[in-house]
Amino acid sequence: MPELPEVEVVRRGLERWAAHRTVADVEVLHPRAVRRHVAGPDDFAHRLKDHRIGTPSRRGKYLWLPLEDTDQAVLAHLGMSGQLLVQPHETPAEKHLRIRVRFADALGTELRFVDQRTFGGLSLHDTSADGLPDVIAHIARDPLDPLFDDEAFHHALRRKRTTIKRALLDQSLISGVGNIYADEALWRARLHYERPTATLTRPRTTELLGHVRDVMNAALAVGGTSFDSLYVNVNGESGYFDRSLDAYGREGMPCRRCATPMRRRPWMNRSSYFCPKCQRPPRVTP
């Protein structure tokens, strides 16, 4: 599933190619793609028609397109395989094309939502005074947000009584961090994924947040992480941060710091990758 860097890459592409364009018509080709829009496909298409798309926004992994002169926005949920592509009109339809948005201008391109597994979708929602769709009001700010409160995050960690990787994936504490970037940041910080959050000092939390931001910015610089053709930017291009990963997916390969073979352990229906020497597991108290 795309994490913050991948979603931000898409947001930037939409800002360049779709923002400030007026919707001429919308074609919903698969009803599941708008299942979160409870009024149905026809209502979704009708409500977008003739509206101008504002500057795309993002919080964590959530991306939305505000409709100018309204208090509503189109929320994009990419799921496991969703893609927002800006394509020339004449480009043949993708096999898993679900929604097509045509614009009332002569630029010759349209916005397409393509989703192989149909776990994602688009939906229209009311927004708050600060432009946030109401359905994601509970989502915390992400670490690249200038208003993210490092001090409040540290205190929340200390109160949470959980482990550090669980906390990094808790969208009510910090958004945008998924399995890949959690493993990468923890490796950089030399923290084991099962380290209790109550044991983190303020300097350790500061260091960890610095690594989270560094790894995300590094991924952003190269278009995000693509392990297959399902994650692409709006022009259909893959990112290549997977070439720079230090932890994720490197089971059995030498740690880039100490050369100890990296390990993988099952974790919450996922996997955690770590160095057994650099990232010592917490001591178990009898």
Curated annotation (Swiss-Prot):
Zinc finger residue ranges, FPG-type: 246-280
Stored Pfam families: Fapy_DNA_glyco (PF01149), H2TH (PF06831)
Record bears the keyword Zinc: yes
Cofactors: Zn(2+)
GO biological processes: base-excision repair
Positions annotated as active site in the UniProt record: P2, E3, K61, R270
InterPro entries: DNA_glyclase/AP_lyase_DNA-bd, DNA_glyclase_Znf_dom_DNA_BS, Formamido-pyr_DNA_Glyclase, FPG_cat, MutM-like_N-ter, Ribosomal_uS13-like_H2TH, Znf_DNA_glyclase/AP_lyase
Xref: NCBIfam families: fpg, PRK01103.1
Entry similarity comment: Belongs to the FPG family.
Subunit structure: Monomer.
UniProt-recorded name of the protein: Formamidopyrimidine-DNA glycosylase
Origin species: Streptomyces coelicolor (strain ATCC BAA-471 / A3(2) / M145)
